[in-house]
Amino acid sequence: MKKSVLTAFITVVCATSSVMAADDNAITDGSVTFNGKVIAPACTLVAATKDSVVTLPDVSATKLQTNGQVSGVQTDVPIELKDCDTTVTKNATFTFNGTADTTQITAFANQASSDAATNVALQMYMNDGTTAIKPDTETGNILLQDGDQTLTFKVDYIATGKATSGNVNAVTNFHINYY
């Protein structure tokens, strides 16, 4: 019986020592590192401009008879920026992504899905109305101003051959690069 009590006592002492030793080796402290960044964007894009629809005027097919001929009826494409801070950056470029026309590679292809006009594309321009904006290509430098501003681009119909009447549609997603 003494052996049983002694054996039980030794077992309890060993088990307690093991638990205490395990607690001494347990990892109870650590650290968490947080990384982040507060940015000061140059401008904020006005929400109404983000996904806008520009309705072009109707143009007679007789104004678009030969490849490269434009209708001469340019339509404004306004992009509104607000809260611009030129202490952050003074310049921007735009990239208008979309499907380039196969004949007029500087123009956006007509993507109308029903009753589409043929031999017609859409040519975008910088605000001067003469500097063409090629799809998927960065524009020239645009000087930003402090506060709110509207950057105005232009668009016009351009013939890729003798145009026929019908719908014209193109979509371009744009990206602003501040530098």
Curated annotation (Swiss-Prot):
Induction: Induced in the presence of epithelial cells. It holds the Pfam family Fimbrial. Its main location: other. Keywords: Fimbrium, Signal. InterPro entries: Adhesion_dom_fimbrial (IPR000259), Adhesion_dom_fimbrial_sf (IPR036937), Adhesion_dom_sf (IPR008966), Bact_Fimbrial_Adh_Pro (IPR050263). One of its GO terms (biological process) is cell adhesion involved in single-species biofilm formation. GO terms for cellular component: pilus. Residues 1-21 form the signal peptide. Disruption phenotype: Mutants show significant reduction in adherence to several cultured epithelial cells (HEp-2, HT-29 and MDBK). It is found in: Fimbrium. Part of the elfADCG fimbrial operon, which could be required for adherence to host epithelial cells. ElfA is an accessory colonization factor that contributes to adherence of bacteria to human intestinal epithelial cells and to animal intestinal tissue in vitro. Binds specifically to laminin, but not to fibronectin or collagen type IV. Belongs to the fimbrial protein family. This is Laminin-binding fimbrial subunit ElfA. It comes from Escherichia coli O157:H7.
